[in-house]
């Protein structure tokens, strides 16, 4: 067969349809009996934004009560052993700790946005604490 020169043609923008092999065509046309339906997945970030809106609306505590109570008791033992706490005292501590952390993360997020980032980093937390006057 003689070689012929190919001429340039305008592209239509899509791939040309391929011919399927007989075995692949048979597999596609046959109904799948044991096929498992793929679970629905949201785009990345959609669920995160939904959670942000949900937690901004809510007023309930975000840290579980018992793990927080154990942490408070563990820290208090370094200062004095056999300390007892009223449940309302631990509740008040938890309220104030969560309020502090939420406001710190808000300031940290502003620092990340100022640096033209969307991800907070440890240097953002350090800057937020320094601007607040908490850092040595």
Swiss-Prot record:
The nucleosome is a histone octamer containing two molecules each of H2A, H2B, H3 and H4 assembled in one H3-H4 heterotetramer and two H2A-H2B heterodimers. The octamer wraps approximately 147 bp of DNA. Belongs to the histone H3 family. One of its GO terms (molecular function) is DNA binding. The gene is hh3. This is Histone H3. The keyword Nucleus applies. The modification N6-acetyllysine is found at residues 10, 15, 19, 24, 28, 37, 57, 65. The modification N6,N6-dimethyllysine is found at residues 5, 15, 28, 37, 80. Pfam families: Histone (PF00125). Signal peptide: none annotated.
């Amino acid at each position: 067969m003689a070689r012929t020169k190919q001429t340039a043609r305008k592209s239509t923008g899509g791939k040309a349809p391929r011919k399927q092999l007989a075995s692949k065509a048979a597999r596609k046309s046959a109904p799948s009996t044991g096929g498992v339906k793929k679970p629905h997945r949201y785009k990345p970030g959609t669920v995160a934004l939904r959670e942000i809106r949900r937690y901004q609306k809510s007023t309930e505590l975000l840290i579980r009560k018992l793990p927080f109570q154990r942490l408070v008791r563990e820290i208090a033992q370094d200062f004095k052993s056999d300390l007892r706490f009223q449940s309302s005292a631990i509740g008040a501590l938890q309220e104030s700790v969560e309020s502090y952390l939420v406001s710190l993360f808000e300031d940290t997020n502003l620092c990340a946005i100022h640096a033209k980032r969307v991800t907070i980093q440890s240097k953002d937390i350090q800057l937020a604490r320094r601007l607040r006057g908490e850092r040595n």
